[in-house]
């Protein structure tokens, strides 16, 4: 998946605040020596995966390279890459872009790593939609970037508002533990969610806060039989974590209560 929406280049990148000091020193030396050669500059991959960050680098180069006397070639955003493959090739005067090596490499490294990780999850899911909640695992200044990268990697949706804006998609989410804890009871929280959320928001209920997961799943299933879309399991490691056996147990108990009729846990109430 790709998104060609232009992203504004941060001023701190343009003025070189995010660049390493030795690049500033290099440009200073070359300037004093009267050297500004026309060069061919290539960025290669160090591993296989999904390339991401191309569009941001193109936006940066459009901003800093002269209109004439330049040539830029790059792979398409979201392309599968192999080890040592050329990702970007720039032909221009070194002084026009040499300062931005740090930003270009950092963008490609982080975004491609996130996109590749997302792609691995999507591949393992075998057709089941995967939603990125990665924004809670990074600094807020890059929350949009990690969600965008996950979307490029194949995720069907992202969780943050800025990620939704950058991918031009509707942010996706379920229920946090805080809502269930404040409401004091899982079914009560689920019914409040059902009452107050727009109809187009999937009713996916968190079921591991107070009681046994299967018990809570049955309770919310009965209370919201006509509207529930799925359940979310987030059992902490201290209680055994999320395991195939736990998923199978919940599935069988839901089937026994006629709340779950799909032939596979992947297709029905489980999330």
Language-model-detected regions and their locations in the chain:
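Single conserved hydrophobic/aromatic residue that forms the stacking wall/gate
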Residues: 260-271
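Flexible, solvent-exposed loop/hinge segments and secondary-structure transition points
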Residues: 1-95, 103, 108-111
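Acidic side chains
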Residues: 17-21, 208, 234-235, 267
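Buried, small/hydrophobic-residue-enriched core segments of structured protein domains
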Residues: 79-81, 88-256
């Amino acid at each position: 998946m790709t998104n060609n929406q232009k992203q504004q280049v941060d001023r701190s990148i343009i003025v070189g605040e995010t660049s390493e000091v030795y690049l500033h020193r290099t440009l200073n030396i070359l300037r004093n020596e009267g050297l500004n050669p026309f060069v061919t500059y290539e960025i290669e991959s160090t591993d296989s995966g999904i390339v991401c960050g191309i569009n941001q680098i193109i936006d940066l180069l459009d901003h800093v390279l002269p209109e004439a006397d330049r040539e830029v070639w790059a792979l398409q955003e979201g392309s599968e890459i192999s080890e040592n493959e050329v990702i970007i090739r720039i032909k221009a005067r070194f002084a026009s872009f040499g300062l931005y090596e740090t930003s270009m490499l950092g963008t490609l490294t982080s975004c491609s790593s996130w996109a590749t990780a997302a792609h691995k999850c999507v591949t393992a899911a075998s057709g089941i939609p995967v939603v990125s909640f990665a924004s809670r695992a990074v600094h807020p200044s890059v929350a949009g970037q990690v969600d965008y990268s996950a979307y490029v990697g194949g995720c069907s949706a992202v969780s943050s508002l800025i990620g939704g804006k950058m991918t031009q998609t509707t942010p996706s989410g379920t229920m946090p533990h805080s809502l269930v804890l404040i409401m004091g009871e899982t079914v009560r929280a689920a019914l409040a969610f059902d009452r107050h959320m727009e109809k187009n928001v999937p009713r996916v209920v968190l079921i591991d806060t107070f009681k046994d997961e299967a018990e809570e799943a049955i309770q919310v299933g009965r209370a919201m039989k006509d509207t529930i879309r799925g359940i979310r399991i987030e059992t902490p490691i201290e209680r055994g974590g999320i395991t195939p056996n736990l998923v199978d147990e919940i599935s069988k108990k839901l089937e026994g209560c006629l709340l779950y009729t799909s032939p596979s846990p992947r297709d029905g109430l489980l999330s």
